[in-house]
Amino acid sequence: METARKSFKTGQGKNNDSVIVIEHVYKKFGTNVVLNDFSLNIQKEENVVVLGKSGSGKSVLIKCIIGLLKPDSGRIEVFGENVPELNHDDLDKIRAKIGFLFQGNALYDSMTVRENLEFPLRRHWIDFSQKEVDALVVEALENVSLAHTIDMMPEELSGGMLKRIALARTMILKPDVILYDEPTTGLDPVTAREIDNLILKLQKKYHTSSIIITHDMNCVKNTADRVALLLNGKCYAEGKYQDFEQSTDKNIKQFFE
């Protein structure tokens, strides 16, 4: 790991297997510095959990990666493209390869489950035939064991089912990278573990890379190939979950005790 940047680093520097490269990113709002020389790389088929307290800048980091916010300085490469420099059309092409699971699920209450899942297909791939769209929707729902909900409304579903539907929609375009924003927040422990297992199952099936933003320690333990601790705007430490558990660093122990 590496902390401050100390050492239990796992050697994840920039290389040909990097799908996301974040280098020396700085972002502030007024006088509030949120990201302060933050650097992190994500490799192919790797789950990296970014751990931090509420308000630490985790969601700001995600928004910078997908181009919703522009960093004040630094570089964010996704699939070899520097996101802050992309125009709208090129940024949209990048986003078509990225799945995003929102903390609040972001399903449309006025749409059926089918219509919610069709939405990203219509937005990014308008040349899909209806037969192809139907097949992708069914596959996505079968992935989360909810094919029977296809014509139901969101209000008819439990919180855990809504999260699984949101995950199905995230995966429907078979993205290369998935960004998860607090995927288990508000769920009971059993349902949260089911979501963790689905994340791992679908990553293995579709060979995706992912960044998981969370402060749920069970989610960290269950899903992380590598953990990055966001503290004071920096990547304070990164390494394996077991390295964090065994660390005597006081800033790390507050999360893992």
Predicted regions and their residues:
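Helix-to-loop junction immediately C-terminal to a conserved catalytic motif
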Residues: 66
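Conserved ABC ATPase "signature" region
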Residues: 130-148
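A short, proline-enriched helix->beta-strand linker immediately N-terminal to the Walker B motif
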Residues: 172-176
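Helix N-cap at the start of a conserved alpha-helix in ABC-type nucleotide-binding domains
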Residues: 189-191
